[in-house]
Amino acid sequence: MMNSQFEKMGSNLIQVMTYGRGTGGTRDVDVEDLYELVDKYPQYLTGVTPYVSASAKVRYQTDDYDRTSVYGVSEAFFKEDTKGTMQGETLAEGRFLSYIDVDRHQNVCVIGDYLAQTAFRGDALGKTISLSGVPYTVIGVLSKSGDSSEGSADDVIYIPYENAQRMGTGTMMMGTDEMFLLTATSRDTASAAKGIVEKRLYKTYQSSDYYMVMT
């Protein structure tokens, strides 16, 4: 599922994975550090979000959805200028997560087409789905992007990232500790933006062994 999600990435999207504390300091790079980069280099970077794979038991009424992927993101994951997510997904109905949803850790979610059709029979908005026993209200439904099969890129739920962190993390790519997504201002600036991010990570970790940056 993770691989199918990232197949949709545009070339102006930057994926950051960290593997733990380096030798250059007493802490890891966190999302606040990356927010500072976006503010400092607006000509190269336009947004950043944590990307948390949550370990959550998904249930609607009496049915379990064991292959549904649950990810925690911030409101920046949805790009107002393109009306889509950083990964190219678009909304079929409803809305995406807002700053207030994320800041207040609201129990709301955006679901993919598979759950919308299979669990809710096309009538998902305003309904609730259980994530590890906690009811989440569906505020948005993504447009179909593939074959809408179980376990596919359409079988996904997005929630506020701190909610996902509290659930415990699921299987991330390559055993990473943390993962972030950033967007460059364009394909032409993506390489320079990647270099800016790498330089900031190296400042903290003092070794490229502790992180990976990909476009």
Which functions belong to the PLM regions below?
Residues R27-V29, D39-Y44, S130-P135, V141-T215:
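Mechanotransmission and gating elements of multispan inner-membrane complexes involved in transport
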Residues Q15, V108, M179-L181:
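Short aromatic/hydrophobic contact patches that present stacked aromatics
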Residues Y51-V52, D63-G168, R187, A192:
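Hydrophobic secondary-structure segments that place a key small or acidic residue at a functional site
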Residues M1-S69, A76-K79, Y99-I100, Q117, ...:
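Hydrophobic, regular-secondary-structure patches
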